[in-house]
Amino acid sequence: MTFEDLRQKLKSGEVSSKELVQEKINRINELDPTLNSFLIVNTELALSKAEHIDKQIASGDHLPPLSGIPIAIKDNLCTKGIKTTCASKILDNFVPPYESTVTKKLLNAGAIMIGKTNMDEFAMGSSTETSAFGPTLNPWNITKVPGGSSGGSAASVAAGLCYGSLGSDTGGSIRQPASFCGVVGMKPTYGRVSRWGLIAFASSLDQVGPFANNVSDAAEILQVISGKDELDSTTVDIPVPNYLETLSKSIKGMKIGLIDNCFDHEGLATDVKESVLSSASLLENLGAEIVNISCPRFNDGIATYYVIAPSEASANLARYDGVKYGFRAEDEQSLIEMTSKSRALGFGSEVKRRILIGTYALSAGYVDAYYKKAQQVRTLIRRDFDDAFKKVDVLLAPTAPTTAFGSGDNIDNPMAMYLSDLLTIPANLAGLPAISLPCGFDKYGLPIGLQLIGNVFEEGKLFQVANQFEKAAEVYKNRPKTDFTL
């Protein structure tokens, strides 16, 4: 059921907003003790707002587009008066005094914030296993991870606990869990959506975007949250097009480039490769021209990212010292001891690992060899994309090299965990928009994600291609069973 379907049902009185919210709360109470996709459920607040919207509907008031629709928020987005933890012990009791720009825009559009979702601590992870509040499980198979870092946002949509959600994407944290959970996830162009109120991981890479069960709903959410924000100097003052108008456009004559580097990688699972290539054939049948294209430095993205992102994290997370807010170690005899102990006890092992990597990369004697060199390679990766978009409209690749891996399989193997973002990281380094949507299933019935990458501020083209594929393939109509048998 799309947002448009929900609007019609609300307008006709076939269903009330309170009934929609109560149904999702009941489902959360039934299923989330197993999944652990939510950290906070705003039961009273959500029902109260739903009642208010129902009164407005009954009065015939003109309402904004998302009125009465329950949407979940990743717990690294500040929500005024509602605890925001970043899934970390160090922020366990942090209640923001202000609202992030994107959540404010959603609320102004009438959306009902049903809760805050679980995530990898400080968005550092690819499996939602590094959360201080326990891992999230994949609703398609609870022995598998949902991906990360936005695993709670993806799993909650896939399991029908909300109609859409917000996540953040630094190296693939929207697209990879979207792939693992069989939903649509969009990472916008860097600067399209405000980061004001997003708790920073890597400021030159972070971007907020939507999860939804279908392309049109993802387009609606992005439409609402996009645009210039005076509170975020990195947002760009470029008009936001009407994404919904692009959905019905034919893709006949569009050039779509298969990034050949992706399909030659030894870590790419056979089921994933076959499904994505089959998807390319379907797009060709819909009128697109499919061409092979090379991005020579595409596979250098992961090494580049794991210098730049930890370096920025090292600087951004220096503010958590136990002094003004967050977790504070007790009974220490000096400020240095208190700060050291607060950080040692407050941060989890993966966060500490990345802080150490970043601090090392920025240290005297190594900054030229690592950080500056990584920034140079980042520029070369962007140039490869620039060259590619002179020849094609959209690029096509798998979202992830594999389907969802087993819970616990990679938690003690950082390199294996990091490689799951191999195919998503380049778009972040180049600041490009990219979308993941379900395109098939592996032999075990786990979802496979198709990734489309666009040129800067061309989210509309991605929605256009994605929607035409979605309508033709109808993969999105398959939903996970929720008896959660092993």
From Swiss-Prot:
InterPro entries given in the database record: Amidase, Amidase_CS, Amidase_dom, AS_sf, GatA
Q: Which keywords, in A-to-Z order, does the entry hold?
A: ATP-binding, Ligase, Nucleotide-binding, Protein biosynthesis
Superkingdom assignment: Bacteria
The yes or no answer to whether the keyword Isomerase is present is no
Pfam families the record matches: Amidase
The UniProt entry's GO CC annotations, sorted and at most eight, read: glutamyl-tRNA(Gln) amidotransferase complex
One of its GO biological process terms is: translation
Q: Name the reaction it catalyses.
A: L-glutamyl-tRNA(Gln) + L-glutamine + ATP + H2O = L-glutaminyl-tRNA(Gln) + L-glutamate + ADP + phosphate + H(+)
Which residues of this protein are catalytic? 74, 149, 173
Cite the HAMAP family for this sequence: GatA
Q: Which family does it belong to?
A: Belongs to the amidase family. GatA subfamily.
Q: What is this protein called?
A: Glutamyl-tRNA(Gln) amidotransferase subunit A
Organism of origin is Prochlorococcus marinus (strain NATL2A)
Lineage at the top is: Bacteria, Bacillati, Cyanobacteriota, Cyanophyceae, Synechococcales
